[in-house]
């Protein structure tokens, strides 16, 4: 409790997109920069206005240099459910905290921001004039002010029922904006090398933030594909490395994904993507490799593992192997010839994710994070289906809906215990293991007549 007295209150203006991902992102970034999530607000839900307590303005600025879920942050001077409550709150704010930004040598500007309602210019001016009791001594400068102050009004979430008066009103000093522009500047549409399942730029940055990726980290993606997740991590200064079982994807060969382009060009590869954004210096390597048979020496190499495993829908789930474990004509003690190309077999989802967790537990540094997508069949989903490992602690579990009956969940886990050989078999002793095996049939359920029937029934019910 004593700590909370030393914290300053800030107002976060959140983007109304990927709502479930916002809280874990902010919590992860605050931990990354030496803060801790503290708030008197009971629930967050869909509201774009969050009141947080943060130790310093430097941490608030660092937070905004990373977040793609928040638009802006303000030092909160006052708030209330009516103009009168706001003015009373402002009058109780310590004058000594205001003075450095209101003195005669400074310039300032006041902005009005409304959520779910549009005000006329006359209404905006009226709200600004009502703040004349504040000790502003500087000059107004609308083009390049030294300090920007904002009145933010919340009119609720229902666009079909907009109240006459706001539910909440806030006043604060603008500190910084978030990194929402990265979503556009790193858009997949503008990218040199893409595939069928290239990750959306916004989600890539969210995953990097959930993983607490920072400068000089080593980040690994065992299902690298076209490397979209590596780009986001490299943007934050991490060195990136990946593997994939698909030779053509790793080497940029084969048919193109883009419309009106039949074959991939000579320079379509992951390294070229990093070069496109000026991030080539963070590229370590990308190899053709089977995630079910990692070729790593024992040790902890990675600060984070950020990945999007294939679900068997648009990309197949494969691993190397053979019905005959040894190629014909090769004795047990002999190595396979260089010309031998391993046969690929189907790779059950439950096996894939358990292998991924074992690999993360073995190769992550203590405190390192694993961030990955888990596809689920919504009608049968339970929290017990999320794979677990004794060395990994679940940090967050966020849902992104894909359809009325399917979704994928962004799972973030942190390594909290040193890996021991017996840990890789722990799941077999757990009651959680049996329901999780249902993921083997995710693809069948996705394409099944059951799925189509559910969609048809939902449609007829709505009619």
Swiss-Prot record:
It is an enzyme of class 2 (transferase). GO terms for molecular function: methyltransferase activity; tRNA (guanine(10)-N2)-methyltransferase activity; tRNA binding. It catalyses: guanosine(10) in tRNA + S-adenosyl-L-methionine = N(2)-methylguanosine(10) in tRNA + S-adenosyl-L-homocysteine + H(+). The modification N-acetylalanine is found at residue 2. GO terms for biological process: methylation; tRNA processing. Its main location: cytoplasm. This is tRNA (guanine(10)-N(2))-methyltransferase TRMT11. The lineage of its organism: Eukaryota, Metazoa, Chordata, Craniata, Vertebrata. PANTHER family: RNA METHYLASE-RELATED (PTHR13370), TRNA (GUANINE(10)-N2)-METHYLTRANSFERASE HOMOLOG (PTHR13370:SF3). It comes from Homo sapiens (Human). The gene is TRMT11. InterPro entries: DNA_methylase_N6_adenine_CS, RlmKL-like_Mtase, SAM-dependent_MTases_sf, tRNA_mtfrase_TRM11. It is found in: Cytoplasm. Keywords: Acetylation, Cytoplasm, Methyltransferase, RNA-binding, S-adenosyl-L-methionine, Transferase, tRNA processing, tRNA-binding. It holds the Pfam family UPF0020.
């Amino acid at each position: 409790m004593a700590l909370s007295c030393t914290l300053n209150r800030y107002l976060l203006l959140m983007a109304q997109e990927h709502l479930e991902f916002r809280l874990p992102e902010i919590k992860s970034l605050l931990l990354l920069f030496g803060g801790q999530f503290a708030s008197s607000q009971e629930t967050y839900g869909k509201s774009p206005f969050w009141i947080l307590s943060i130790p310093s303005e430097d941490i608030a600025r660092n937070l905004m240099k990373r977040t793609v879920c928040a638009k802006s942050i303000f030092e909160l001077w006052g708030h209330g459910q009516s103009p009168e409550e706001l003015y009373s709150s402002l009058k109780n704010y310590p004058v000594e905290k205001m003075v450095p930004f209101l003195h005669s040598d400074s310039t300032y500007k006041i902005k009005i921001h409304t959520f779910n309602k549009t005000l006329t210019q006359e209404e905006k001016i009226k709200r600004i004039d009502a703040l004349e009791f504040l000790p502003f001594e500087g000059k107004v400068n609308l083009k390049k002010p030294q300090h920007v102050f904002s009145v933010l009004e919340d009119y609720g979430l229902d666009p079909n029922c907009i109240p006459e008066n706001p539910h909440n009103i806030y006043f604060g000093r603008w500190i910084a904006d978030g990194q929402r522009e990265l979503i556009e500047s790193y858009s997949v549409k503008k990218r040199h090398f893409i595939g069928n399942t290239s990750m959306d730029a916004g989600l890539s940055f969210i995953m990097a933030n959930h993983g607490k990726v920072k400068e000089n980290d080593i980040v690994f993606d065992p299902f690298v594909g076209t490397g979209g997740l590596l780009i986001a991590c490299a943007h934050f200064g991490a060195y990136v490395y990946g593997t994939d079982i698909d030779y053509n994807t790793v080497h940029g060969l084969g048919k193109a994904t883009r419309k009106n382009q039949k074959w991939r060009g000579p320079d379509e590869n992951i390294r070229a993507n990093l070069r496109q954004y000026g991030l080539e210096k963070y590229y370590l390597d990308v190899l053709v490799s089977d995630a079910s048979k990692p070729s790593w020496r024992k040790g902890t190499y990675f600060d984070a593992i950020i990945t999007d495993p294939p679900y068997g829908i648009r990309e197949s789930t494969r691993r190397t192997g053979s019905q005959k474990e040894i190629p014909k004509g090769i004795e047990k003690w002999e190595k396979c010839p260089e010309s031998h190309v391993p046969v690929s077999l189907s790779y059950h989802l439950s096996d894939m994710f358990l292998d991924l967790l074992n690999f993360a537990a073995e190769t992550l540094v203590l405190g390192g994070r694993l961030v990955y997508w888990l596809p689920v069949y919504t009608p049968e989903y339970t929290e017990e289906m999320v794979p677990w490992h004794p060395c990994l602690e679940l940090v967050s579990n966020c849902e992104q809906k894909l359809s009325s009956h399917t979704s994928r969940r962004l799972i973030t886990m942190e390594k909290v215990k040193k890996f021991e050989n017996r840990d890789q078999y722990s799941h077999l002793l757990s009651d959680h293991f049996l329901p999780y095996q249902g993921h083997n049939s995710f693809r069948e359920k996705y394409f099944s007549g059951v799925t189509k029937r559910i969609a048809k029934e939902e449609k007829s019910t709505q009619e």
